[in-house]
Swiss-Prot record:
Residues 171-188 have a biased composition (Basic and acidic residues). The gene is ureE. GO terms for cellular component: cytoplasm. Keywords: Chaperone, Cytoplasm, Nickel, Nickel insertion. This is Urease accessory protein UreE.
């Protein structure tokens, strides 16, 4: 089994013909966050990916196998939320609230894209945005916190729901104090940050 253990720096320009001839490894965002994984090229060949911890692969990246061959990375279509708004301010507000919980977000011309999550979808709709579930490649911003991903309905589900309640003032007339201090037994590279932090919401 061949091992893909080097990524060619994005600023290194390769001959287009070399890249065009390279086999493709198509991966969803979650897999592109992993520095070590067993994968299958689009040709059907099984390979091992062994990259420095914290590496987050992007569509178009080129890896080098231990035999010197090149492999091109492609972002696989996956289930995502496509968020649009009637005005830029509403979309900016949505981006702010997503960034506030370190949710990985792809920012495009007039849209936001994020991993499908029913709680976040509800929050975004209440903020006044149009949210549609679709199937498309997902390439979030690296940003100050690195990439980042979340795990469906585990410990972060409660945090998502608490955030949704807080954002929309569902506790008007009440004095709530939420103290969250979660210890997650997850290990991710710096490019895939959950946002492991305590919240103190008043």
């Amino acid at each position: 089994m061949r091992t893909l253990d080097k990524r060619i720096a994005p600023n290194v320009k390769l001959a287009a013909s070399l890249v065009a001839r390279a086999p493709t490894l198509t991966l969803a965002y979650d897999a592109r966050c992993k520095s070590r994984l067993a994968a299958t090229l689009d040709t059907g060949e099984d390979v091992a990916v062994l990259l420095p911890r914290g590496t987050v692969l992007r569509d178009g990246d080129v890896l080098v196998a231990d035999d010197g061959a090149l492999v091109r990375i492609a972002a696989a279509p996956e289930t995502v939320l496509l968020v649009r708004a009637a005005d830029p301010l509403t979309l900016m507000r949505a981006a702010y609230h997503l960034g506030n919980r370190h949710t990985p977000v792809e920012i495009g011309d007039g849209y936001l894209k994020l991993e499908a999550d029913p709680v976040l979808a509800d929050m975004l709709r209440r903020l006044g945005t149009q949210v549609d579930e679709t199937h498309a490649p997902f390439q979030p911003e690296a940003g100050a916190y690195g990439g980042g991903h979340k795990h469906g309905h585990d410990a972060t589900f409660a945090e998502d729901y608490a955030l949704a309640q807080q954002v929309f003032g569902e506790h008007h007339g009440h004095a709530h104090s939420h103290d969250h201090d979660h210890d997650h037994d997850h290990q991710h590279g710096p490019g895939c940050t959950h946002g492991h932090h305590g919240h103190d919401h008043h």
